[in-house]
């Protein structure tokens, strides 16, 4: 997710530090090539592009500048849904309250805590690192376990390891419905320490370990529904854990680019990025709430997300803005798919320890994460049966 400009080390200092250190355990690099740094095409706003080095990418993030890296995907997206009226009609009120409330009772903070403790034990989940591959492998095994234990695998549910050239793969859990119309729930699995990405620890408990385990628990809860697990829902439901969000939404772009090329019909996408930190809001005298993005999102879908929070969560919501390219919903929008995003609070009160060694579990509220899991499950179930 976006980094706050309050991080102490400035971009200038980072450039010098990075230039002085040869990255360790970074996949796909050639230590014998020093004469010219590879450059990447980034987009700072729709159609506003710039060529930068990787070092300059991290400097921009340290300065609080969001971007999407379109080096491999330029000239492929067209942003038809940004800040526009939705072309998909979503339910005006909840249709399955009894079912969703019952399923939400099965959600467990203990499960999320146990999963996040293991997930943050990897030195870093940096997408070019060996431990980034190892963390993805562990996460995929947990997703597969949920699918298998629910019985959904016996009815066509699958877990795909979506390969990328940098090593760490994205993960897609697919629960087929009666149609191929698809609803996507997303989070990003990678972490980063912007000071020295390939060397320093990046536990990434909040960014986005919290979102990762939130939607994993929502998947487990959703599959307690026999109708969904047995493939009787109207629409197909997918849970995505993207690689390389921190590098500029690289993993999610590859996924949604593939979907567009294959004419996949995605009707809605909800991203959960940073779901566990409440201290910032409470210290500011604000109420604990679910943050709902209102910029660079599909407006109709965002209204629906607000209704989900109002109906199924114990907390209210607060509208907030994160600017362009702050998380993977940007990739869905880029390829014409309606997308929305939820986060832990208003952006000015979100976790300022992200992208450092201090993004740790001890600062998080699993009760707050539970509310995001309720949001995820309610969103998935209501739209699983929606007559698109």
Curated annotation (Swiss-Prot):
This is Leucine aminopeptidase 1. Residues 1-19 form the signal peptide. Its EC number is 3.4.11.-. Binds 2 Zn(2+) ions per subunit. Zn(2+) 1 binds at residues 188, 207, 273. It is an enzyme of class 3 (hydrolase). Keywords: Aminopeptidase, Disulfide bond, Glycoprotein, Hydrolase, Metal-binding, Protease, Secreted, Signal, Zinc, Zymogen. It is found in: Secreted. Extracellular aminopeptidase that allows assimilation of proteinaceous substrates.
